[in-house]
Amino acid sequence: MLTQVLAGALLAAPLEFREHTIATDLKGGYQVVPCDVNHDGKIDLIALASGMTELVWFENPTWERHVIARDLHGMINLAAWDMDGDGIPEIVLAHEFSMRAKESIGIVSVLKHNGDPRQLWNIQEIDRLPTSHRLRWADIDGSGKKVVVNAPLTGAHAEAPDYRDRVPLVFYRPGDWKRQIIDDSSEGLVHCITITDWDHDGRDEILSAGFTGIQLYKLSAGRRWMRTEITKGDPAPWPKSGSSDVAVGQLGKERYLAAIEPWHGNEVAVYRMSAVAWQREVIDASLVDGHTIVTADLANDGTDQIIAGFRGQPQRVYIYSFDGKRWNRQTLDDGGMSAAACAVADLNGDGKLDIACIGSATHNLKWYENLGPAKRTQP
């Protein structure tokens, strides 16, 4: 089902943002991660650029640049979390990545500060798994002790364009960092993983998006991993099938999924649960090399908007808002951001979620200040 998205400005007052440029020299910008790096209560931004050999972070509020580590090649993804409770996050990094599995070393390393996060950090290699591509921290057993989930892009013997091979999904526990298998039955290509407490039981589940669609992985009470297919994604023939990126959002009390489809695709698809199954609605089919999708309550009204960005021309970032009947689109950035990744956080402490995006072809990092109303309080 294809629904033509309508310009939000024609139907409702658009959300208002003020654009701020932080950096313009991040060659191959690929990921931006908001977190408090220096334990001062302000949300900083870690910027990963695949065309650079330095991993850097920008300190809020002046956005002074600091180098975390040097001489890193083929950086592709990171996840940050304070695993030792000192107030400063540890970083798990995937590097030495290549799209060609046979040439992808797939190094996974842990980076830890030396007492001053503004100085160079220590690096410890923990694994080598070809095409290691997406890393996320997750509390899989509800203990509060998170593990690192690693989703390689493809299997070790996969070749373009079909990438026919089994793709492992693994995790590591801090300490011994031993690789443990979650699943190795998925085929093709897996582009994204998203961590969510799917059934509200205090334990995180894993959503993956790839050629076989959107899958859910859950650790059972018997400590066995269970895999459930949520949706097959785009119904086109392989390798144009499935999903590329997925996010979980809320329309009041109703949960929905937002996805870019197919891999690096042109569609923004929304999935809402009917009586028996998830129903797919394509709300936009105009993206060119879609690469990031995020959901967040930008209006502070209990309903999540969708933020989607694409790397190809004309290089735009869109926001989609639901008015009760249809999704309305507004442009956040028109031509100035080839968005490889966007993230949301309250960057200026005013109670509103702001947006940060990093551009691949545009080599830049921006944050978009939310000028809307603060969170409503109960009378």
Predicted regions and their residues:
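Beta-propeller-forming repeat regions
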Residues: 12-379
